[in-house]
């Protein structure tokens, strides 16, 4: 098979002929310093690799400096291969090429060299790997001199000119590397012609690339056996490494970019494997950062210098937390590879196949590479912290690359699949389960494999929290502040994308799991597999069945799936063969349940029914209700009155109180027949007993109602009875907490609205794959209403604001389904005529007009001014607290065309105008904004009028002449109030004023065209988006440095919706909950995602375009927002404990802190002693007659009570007996997250659905004509 006398080996860097002979005996004696090579990539079918007989691969050999997957020889014809070569070489693009270096020479070299070097195995052969992104470097790539350009840029033949072209790999080439390279190879006995017949003809670039690989591989072999210039080469490598580390330490983007590009070019001294056995084929070009002789030092802060400010001390501590957190994270990634992956790959017999190991640990190595590089740069930055104090740019440079997103996306999308493989292996392979248990026991912290693998999913939220803390302690003007804001934006955007991809992956997994539990022939299976279903909500709820008297019959956990058009309920079916084994497995990795579908129904037929609901949503007379588990159906009206769905204990206590009240009433009648007069036994005392019992009953009913905050009652359609009457059955689910119930009610309501024609679809997501759908958080068009009740006049819209008012009369579900509570104030008018103000109530699912009144001139702008306590919790709140007699209510300000400013109270819609004034001039009031110090009015002549805040009933001093500041010669189109500044636009320039003194700080040009004016400004995070009077572009500016950061052309988002439309202008802007709403003069509304945190609100996504719009320009975009009452969020346990805890306190201690651990014991003692049955009567000392008692009479002290307050609880409920207090503020509610109900309102002429004809939808009458002023209201899902 081989010849044993190979000719001499050429020198390093010399061109090698295709038939270059092997090394000579002289070279064999002086082996020099040998290079180590990696083992071949591990595959499940290990027999596919070409291994020299008798030479097994060594696992502990030193990894190579540079890795090659194959040894191609592209310059020879495959048919010319010697007949002895049974396994033809397969190059990376899949071509089978005959070996120019014959099998005779290969095996001879192997026998000669194996006597003095480590054992070596040729890499496993691969196929179906296509390099599809290889750029052509020079037109003369095939000239003989081109072969000398190797990957080693410092290794060249003496006297030969160095190639000037860049032979490295770019990041885009590595990102386009095919992931199919990890596929198993076919048996080597397959004929070459069969392989080659399926491969395309090689391009010249690929041919040149293969030749270069052959040359490089041969020179590496020459280095291995020669090695005479090794010392010189190592010195050059170390020098180059030092230069690159200095570049990384420089802290500039250029230095970091040079380091990254050096690594991407596979610089030899940076390419060394630290993780043994990690030879996956899915390499993305991210190389290990361990160096040959230089190991990067661990990041460590030096001693704290003297004289640091408190903020600098805090920043050092935060930096230490970042270093510690990153070190722990990198160690966890190494543990995954070293403690789990590598042993599983090397285990014989294998507990998990190599293919499954690659799937389970997919992209872990690449994630480790990213963070190892970040740790090197972090180490250099930490060493220089006291002189630079910069770290934001390091985060930007490390995590803004698409490669990081791709690696993490692959890992996150594969996470569910990896856990599924681990779960299945635990159930079917005891050796694998034993391996996991042993590894967990051996670890110091006892963290499971799942606990380690979930850390990459949680990594970026941890970074965000640390950077937020760092940004809070970085003052303005600090060189690191803008970098930190950009870093926060990059991490937030990355985390949002990963969360969305994780949500989609989990959604697909849940639907697939549900589909497996349905028969293939069922209609539900066809619906689930059609690809048209979107999972909106999925949760495990407890289904309960109650009897007629409220007793709990049974309960069982169900998995409930809310799809975009149906509701599915399934049993959670656990069938473990060994219950104990199941528990052991669940402690190592979460087990996914198997489902058995119980029922499913179309979403429009599902109704949410609340306890005490009047039944207006369904017809009681023609409906029978059968409770789940009941054998007999009852009429809806009877069932509504008889069934109580509270806890059995509360229901029993309520019934006992009802019986006791009947007995006490009989006692009262008997007392009225007494002939004597007694101080503590008379009709006054008896009536007080009755009132006290009635109050206890009301409290008990409220407790039952509070318990129902976690009860979701669904009315579902059933089969009709024998007479044909429809039967609906009631299903009661217990949710984990009130938030869960709110979420279910809200999503059910919005999902029904989403099935309307105007929302099918409601948004278009332009994407390359044409498969993306509107996400579940997408706003849904709830209604379309005329802006003005009077249609006789053609009124133009001027502005709109929302005045939030919480209504305590709304029920629990009404809060979840209605629009944000409060009132909409809509202003407008007609040119040359008067104005009109319309007030809508939003305390229902659709708005309705409650008041309309005229004003002297058309309304041009409206501003809502909240309570000072609502607006700011600092100085304003303390100012109001110092003068309790001053009550400042929310107000609404109107700016008119005739220069008038009108002030109205916003709480009571019947309130008359509180104050009015005229602007200087008088000039039309184009815009209004309020700040903590002034009410600012932008006028037509470029003057800014400022009305100072007062401490009277009217919050602004409108009687005195305002402070006037000339901003520019043109009109002030828009104003923006920031924390410490006010921005005013005049033409293309924006002037920045101090918020307190209104002194001009600076000004800048937002647009280069003098004829263009800034028309809109909205703030988000640390940036301000601006729109202009002409053009379709919007621009982003930094609030602190005023730097222009980004420009977006809206026209590119609407070209497919409005083909041929060349001129587009932005007419309105709004930012709300991470979404930038853009209205155009064509009636089209564009939605763009922006970050929500304190970073820079850059736009990175493609956004969405609404198919619902206006026939004319979008006049304004406004937000309606209200916060749900805190008592709604209290769970049933807290509600049950709340009144009971208050019962144990005297009246003067009702608002103290939560009782200690002995409160439960005190309640039990009170219950055993009994309740003092008193309501209004605190003492009977003032009543006539003797005291009926065997004890001595009490001292004649009128202030003394007959009983101690600790014995009773009735009179502590409220000071006024006629007022029923629902709940008192609780300390545990202080930390609760606020839940905002949000709706977006757009105003313009008419309504248009861009998927159909203008003015309406097919088959439905248009709500208004094309010329009427119209409001479109979008409802946003609750952010829980």
Swiss-Prot record:
The keyword 4Fe-4S does not apply. The modification Phosphotyrosine is found at residues 131, 152. One of its GO terms (molecular function) is guanyl-nucleotide exchange factor activity. It holds the Pfam family RhoGEF. Residues 26-46 have a biased composition (Acidic residues). Residues 314-501 form the DH domain. Residues 78-89 have a biased composition (Low complexity). Keywords: Cytoplasm, Guanine-nucleotide releasing factor, Phosphoprotein. One of its GO terms (biological process) is positive regulation of stress fiber assembly. SMART domains: RhoGEF. Its main location: cytoplasm. The modification Phosphoserine is found at residues 40, 279. Residues 183-193 have a biased composition (Basic and acidic residues). Residues 1-94, 161-202, 1133-1163, 1186-1207 are annotated as: Disordered. Transmembrane segments: none annotated. Residues 1-10 have a biased composition (Pro residues). GO terms for cellular component: cytosol. Interacts with RHOA, RHOB and RHOC. Acts as a guanine nucleotide exchange factor (GEF) for RHOA, RHOB and RHOC. PANTHER family: RHO GUANINE NUCLEOTIDE EXCHANGE FACTOR, RHO GUANINE NUCLEOTIDE EXCHANGE FACTOR 10-LIKE PROTEIN. This is Rho guanine nucleotide exchange factor 10-like protein. It comes from Mus musculus. The gene is Arhgef10l.
């Amino acid at each position: 098979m081989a010849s044993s006398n190979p000719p001499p080996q050429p020198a390093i860097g010399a061109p090698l002929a295709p038939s270059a002979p092997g090394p000579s005996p002289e070279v064999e004696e002086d082996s020099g310093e040998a290079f180590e090579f990696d083992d071949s990539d591990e595959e499940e079918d290990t027999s596919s690799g070409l291994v020299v007989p008798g030479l097994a691969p060594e696992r502990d050999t030193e990894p190579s400096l540079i890795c090659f997957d194959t040894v191609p020889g592209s310059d020879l014809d495959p048919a010319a291969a010697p007949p002895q070569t049974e396994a033809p070489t397969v190059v990376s693009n899949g071509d089978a090429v005959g070996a120019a270096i014959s099998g005779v020479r290969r095996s001879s070299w192997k026998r000669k060299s194996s006597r003095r070097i480590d054992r070596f195995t040729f890499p496993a052969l691969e196929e179906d790997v296509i390099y599809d992104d290889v750029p052509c470097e020079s037109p003369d790539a095939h000239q003989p001199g081109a072969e000398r350009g190797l990957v080693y840029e410092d290794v060249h033949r003496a006297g030969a000119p160095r190639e000037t072209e860049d032979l490295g790999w770019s990041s885009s080439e590595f990102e386009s590397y095919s992931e199919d390279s990890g596929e198993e190879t076919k048996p080597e006995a397959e004929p070459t012609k069969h392989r080659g017949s399926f491969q395309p003809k090689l391009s010249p670039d690929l041919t040149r690339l293969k030749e270069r690989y052959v040359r490089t591989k041969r020179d590496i072999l020459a280095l291995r056996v020669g090695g005479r210039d090794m010392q010189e080469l190592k010195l050059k490598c170390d020098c180059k490494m030092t230069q690159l580390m200095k570049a990384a330490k420089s802290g500039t983007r250029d230095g970091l970019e040079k380091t990254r590009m050096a690594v991407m070019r596979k610089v030899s001294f940076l390419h060394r494997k630290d993780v043994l056995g990690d030879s996956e084929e899915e390499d993305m070009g991210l190389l290990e950062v361990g160096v040959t002789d230089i190991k990067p030092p661990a990041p460590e802060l030096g001693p704290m210098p003297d004289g640091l400010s408190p903020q600098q001390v805090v920043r050092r501590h935060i930096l230490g937390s970042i270093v510690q957190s990153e070190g722990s994270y990198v160690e966890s990634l190494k543990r995954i590879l070293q403690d789990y992956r590598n042993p599983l790959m090397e285990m014989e017999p294998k507990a998990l196949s190599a293919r499954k190991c690659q799937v389970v640990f997919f992209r872990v190595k690449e994630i480790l590479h990213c963070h190892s590089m970040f740790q090197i740069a972090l180490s250099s930055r930490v060493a220089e912290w006291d002189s630079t104090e910069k770290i934001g740019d390091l985060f930007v440079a490390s995590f803004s690359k698409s490669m990081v997103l791709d690696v993490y996306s692959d890992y996150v999308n594969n996470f569910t699949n990896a856990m599924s493989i681990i779960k299945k292996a635990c159930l079917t392979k005891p050796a694998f389960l034993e391996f996991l248990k042993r590894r967990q026991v051996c670890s110091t912290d006892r963290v499971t494999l799942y606990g380690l693998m979930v850390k990459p999913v949680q990594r970026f939220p941890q970074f965000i929290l640390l950077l937020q803390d760092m940004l809070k302690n970085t003052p303005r003007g600090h060189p690191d502040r803008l970098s930190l804001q950009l870093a926060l934006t990059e991490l937030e955007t990355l985390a949002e994308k990963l969360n969305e991809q994780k949500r989609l992956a989990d959604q697909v997994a849940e639907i697939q799991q549900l589909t497996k539990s349905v028969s293939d022939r069922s209609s539900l299976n066809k619906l689930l597999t059609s690809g048209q279903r979107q999972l909106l909500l999925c949760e495990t709820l407890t289904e309960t069945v109650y009897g007629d008297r409220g007793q709990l019959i049974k309960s069982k956990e169900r998995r409930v799936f809310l799809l975009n058009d149906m509701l599915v309920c399934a049993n959670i079916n656990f069938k473990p063969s060994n219950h104990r084994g199941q528990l052991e497995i669940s402690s190592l990795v979460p087990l996914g349940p198997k489902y058995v579908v119980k029922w499913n129904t179309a979403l429009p037929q599902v109704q949410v029914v609340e306890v005490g609901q009047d039944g207006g949503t369904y017809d009681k007379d023609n409906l029978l209700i059968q409770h789940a588990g009941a054998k007999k159906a009852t009429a809806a009206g009877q069932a509504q009155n008889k069934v109580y769905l509270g806890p059995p204990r509360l229901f029993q206590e309520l019934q006992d109180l009802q019986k006791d009240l009947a007995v006490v009433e009989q006692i009262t009648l008997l007392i009225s027949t007494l002939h004597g007069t007694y101080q503590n036994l008379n009709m006054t005392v008896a009536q007080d007993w009755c009132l006290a019992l009635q109050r206890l009953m009301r409290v008990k009913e409220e407790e039952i109602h509070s318990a129902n905050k976690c009860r979701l009652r669904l009315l579902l359609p059933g089969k009709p009875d024998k007479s044909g009457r429809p039967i609906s059955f009631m299903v009661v689910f217990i949710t984990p907490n009130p938030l869960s119930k709110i979420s279910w009610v809200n999503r059910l309501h919005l999902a029904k609205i989403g099935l309307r024609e105007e929302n099918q679809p409601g948004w278009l997501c332009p994407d390359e794959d044409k498969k993306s759908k509107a996400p579940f958080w997408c706003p849904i068009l709830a209604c379309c209403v005329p802006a003005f009740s009077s249609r006789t006049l053609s009124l133009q819209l001027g502005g709109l604001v929302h005045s939030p008012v919480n209504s305590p009369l709304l029920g629990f579900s009404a809060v979840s389904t209605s629009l944000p509570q409060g009132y909409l104030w809509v202003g407008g008018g007609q040119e040359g005529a008067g104005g009109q103000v319309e007030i809508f109530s939003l305390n229902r699912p659709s708005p309705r007009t409650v008041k309309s009144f005229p004003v002297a001139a058309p309304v041009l702008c409206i501003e809502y001014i909240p309570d000072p306590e609502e607006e700011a919790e600092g100085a304003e709140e303390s100012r109001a607290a110092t003068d309790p007699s001053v009550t400042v209510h929310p107000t609404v300000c109107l700016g008119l065309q005739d220069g008038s400013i009108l002030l109205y109270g916003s709480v009571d819609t019947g309130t008359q105008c509180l104050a009015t004034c005229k602007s200087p001039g008088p000039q039309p009031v184009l815009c209004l904004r309020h700040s903590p110090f002034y009410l600012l009015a932008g006028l037509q002549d470029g003057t800014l009028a400022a009305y100072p805040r007062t401490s009277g009933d009217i919050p602004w001093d409108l009687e005195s002449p305002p402070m006037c500041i000339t901003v520019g010669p043109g009109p002030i189109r828009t104003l923006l109030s920031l924390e410490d500044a006010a921005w005013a636009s005049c033409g293309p320039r924006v002037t920045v004023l101090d918020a307190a003194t209104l002194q001009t700080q600076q000004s800048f040009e937002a647009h280069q065209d003098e004829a263009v004016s800034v028309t809109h400004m909205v703030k988000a995070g640390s940036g301000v988006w601006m729109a202009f009077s002409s053009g379709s572009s919007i621009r982003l500016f930094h609030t602190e440095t005023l730097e222009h950061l980004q420009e977006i052309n809206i026209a590119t988002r609407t070209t497919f919706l409005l083909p041929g439309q060349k001129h587009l202008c932005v007419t309105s802007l709004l930012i709300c909950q991470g979404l930038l709403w853009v209205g155009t003069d064509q009636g089209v509304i564009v939605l763009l995602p922006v970050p929500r945190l304190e970073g820079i609100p850059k736009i990175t996504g493609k956004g969405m375009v609404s198919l619902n719009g206006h026939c004319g320009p979008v006049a304004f975009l406004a937000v309606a927002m209200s916060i749900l009452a805190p008592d709604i969020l209290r769970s049933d346990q807290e509600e049950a404990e709340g009144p009971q805890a208050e019962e144990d306190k005297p009246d003067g201690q009702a608002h103290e802190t939560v009782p200690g651990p002995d409160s439960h014991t005190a309640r039990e003692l009170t219950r055993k002693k009994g309740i003092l049955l008193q309501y209004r009567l605190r003492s009977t000392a003032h009543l006539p007659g003797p005291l009926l008692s065997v004890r001595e009479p009490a001292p004649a002290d009128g202030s003394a009570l007959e009983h101690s307050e600790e014995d009773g609880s009735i009179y502590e409920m409220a000071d006024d007996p006629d007022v029923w207090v629902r709940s008192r503020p609780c300390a545990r509610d202080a930390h609760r997250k606020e839940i905002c109900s949000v709706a977006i309102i757009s105003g313009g002429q008419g309504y248009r659905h861009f998927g159909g004809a203008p003015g309406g939808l097919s088959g439905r009458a248009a709500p208004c004509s094309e010329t009427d002023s119209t409001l479109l209201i979008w409802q946003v899902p609750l952010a829980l």
